[in-house]
Amino acid sequence: MKKQRNLRSMAAQAVEQVVEQGQSLSNILPPLQQKVSDKDKALLQELCFGVLRTLSQLDWLINKLMARPMTGKQRTVHYLIMVGLYQLLYTRIPPHAALAETVEGAVAIKRPQLKGLINGVLRQFQRQQEELLAEFNASDARYLHPSWLLKRLQKAYPEQWQSIIEANNQRPPMWLRVNRTHHSRDSWLALLDEAGMKGFPHADYPDAVRLETPAPVHVLPGFEEGWVTVQDASAQGCMAWLAPQNGEHILDLCAAPGGKTTHILEVAPEAQVVAVDIDEQRLSRVYDNLKRLGMKATVKQGDGRYPSQWCGEQQFDRILLDAPCSATGVIRRHPDIKWLRRDRDIPELAQLQSEILDAIWPHLKSGGILIYATCSVLPEENSLQIKAFLQRTADAELCETGTPEQPGKQNLPGAEEGDGFFYAKLIKK
């Protein structure tokens, strides 16, 4: 039997690691969830994701409710109060239970002497909630985004920035990709219906299904057998542009965790696929995905800037470059991105993308197709990146996606319920 743990203190410590130490929630949360019961896993996730989604609001409230911020060894208490405020504002947990569990969290983090302080701050919020929220809703903090990102979105999308941030602040839907080598989408939807769940097909992407209500993967029909994979609809759109064919040599660059590698093999089972990623740890997930779906690909660790080190002089019929990016299109799915990214990261990422594009282009056969994709919404990483590449690369031609002046196709977060995503299809003359 698993030890009873205080979920509020665990969530507070996880959020502190993200905000103060720059760690990714996707790395921190899974090992924490292993320590709690199945019924508590979802609540722990809700508390972590929810606090990070609304962090600027919770921070603003604490600054109003407390004369001095908690610092040093007491900093975790700041995040514990955030967890308490989040429960009072956004969950159906009865207020008395939210308060009691949060106050008890002080014992779990070895700060029992601060139980009275935590209780006092949360009760003060309850008394002043109406006037505090009215003041908050008139402040810039109401957008729940860091100021540098807000400015970039306002500049890039003067008409749409508000709808982008609204989408970023929502909970994401759960999209699946039906493995067409096992089932048609309709036949798998029938299995889903038999299992007592409901799904909706995407209008444009033939394998995509949106669940009416997100569910654990182990309850999905045939998940362990490889019949279905979790993948956002916008990410599935890459295959429409890549259009892989049997017998071709195809490179999936920056491939981890392998969702697009396996999608290529579902569409073209006899393609010769090479999947490359710089992160050896994340490559283990590519192997896991290939194994679950019963597929084979050549998997290599390598830096996209130096392809000769891992593929020699080899050339490919098609290349999918899912470039390293700011991930500003998937904030609703990974709210920690708002607090992990810095303004200075954007030019650095744009430079890295440029170097990878220039390095990999010679490894595309004449007449071959390269899909440049990111999960960003920032022009510096997307349309401006491709525009500059076309200007300096004589044998590169834009195909089907935009114009030379405004190259690529930009999906914004929430459009057709998908993530923010960018694609550009390039052909080598």
Swiss-Prot record:
The active site is at 375 (nucleophile). Keywords: Cytoplasm, Methyltransferase, RNA-binding, rRNA processing, S-adenosyl-L-methionine, Transferase. The keyword Protein biosynthesis does not apply. It is found in: Cytoplasm. Gene3D superfamilies: Helix hairpin bin, NusB-like, Sun protein, domain 3, Vaccinia Virus protein VP39. InterPro entries: MeTrfase_RsmB-F_NOP2_cat, MeTrfase_RsmB-F_NOP2_dom, NusB-like_sf, NusB_RsmB_TIM44, RCMT, rRNA_ssu_MeTfrase_B, rRNA_ssu_MeTfrase_B_ent, RsmB-like_ferredoxin. Belongs to the class I-like SAM-binding methyltransferase superfamily. RsmB/NOP family. This is Ribosomal RNA small subunit methyltransferase B. The gene is rsmB.
